[in-house]
């Protein structure tokens, strides 16, 4: 999987399935490399990604992010491998610990210490048994990592990081922690871009 320099992060829950597929096809036609979609209280992110992958041919579809409290690590590993095998290695798994109000308030889970909880999750995902047809290439994972400890974990156990809503200074610091060979998929909000189609 080779990411292009520009992708789009968008919530698609307000769109019908047909409109979300049409949106993904438009992005693909415009030359964007990836579509990142979120997971909160709408569609389950892996089923949403499967739909978008099935309706595109070159676009990378990424979970930005899949909440680790929404499923166990074995389920995440199976989904990641299955989606990559089915799509020709076009699925990028973004994982995150989410936020206390969503985890405890909405999902009714106990929110653990973020770095320790994520480490345990990643180790479980790595050890997960998978007996279906494997994807051609090893699937890639990035972490929703903002602080230095989560960025260090991303560098140690994953392919990189997906920081959300951060400054250029943070991006520079994240690159220093991750090193030159890890993915750094930064979400930057566009204030004015001067284009009518986005």
Where are these regions (language model features)?
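Active-site-adjacent structural elements that line small-molecule/cofactor binding pockets in enzymes
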Residues: 1-197
């Amino acid at each position: 999987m080779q990411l292009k320099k520009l992708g789009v992060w968008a919530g698609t829950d307000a769109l019908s399935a047909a409109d979300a597929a049409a949106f993904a096809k438009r992005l693909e036609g415009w030359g964007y490399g990836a579509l990142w979609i979120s997971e909160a209280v709408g569609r389950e992110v892996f089923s949403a990604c499967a739909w978008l992958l099935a309706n595109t041919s070159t676009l990378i579809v990424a979970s930005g992010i899949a909440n680790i409290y929404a499923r166990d690590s074995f389920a995440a590993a199976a989904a990641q491998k299955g989606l990559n095998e089915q799509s020709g290695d076009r699925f990028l798994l973004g994982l995150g610990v989410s936020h206390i109000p969503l985890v405890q308030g909405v999902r009714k889970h106990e929110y653990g210490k973020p770095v320790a909880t994520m480490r345990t999750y990643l180790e479980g995902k790595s050890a997960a048994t998978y007996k279906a047809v494997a994807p051609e290439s090893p699937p890639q994972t990035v972490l929703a990592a903002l602080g230095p400890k989560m960025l260090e974990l991303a560098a140690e156990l994953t392919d990189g990081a997906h920081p959300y809503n951060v400054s250029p200074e943070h991006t520079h610091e994240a690159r220093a922690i991750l090193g030159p060979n890890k993915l750094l998929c930064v979400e930057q909000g566009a204030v004015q871009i001067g284009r009518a189609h986005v």
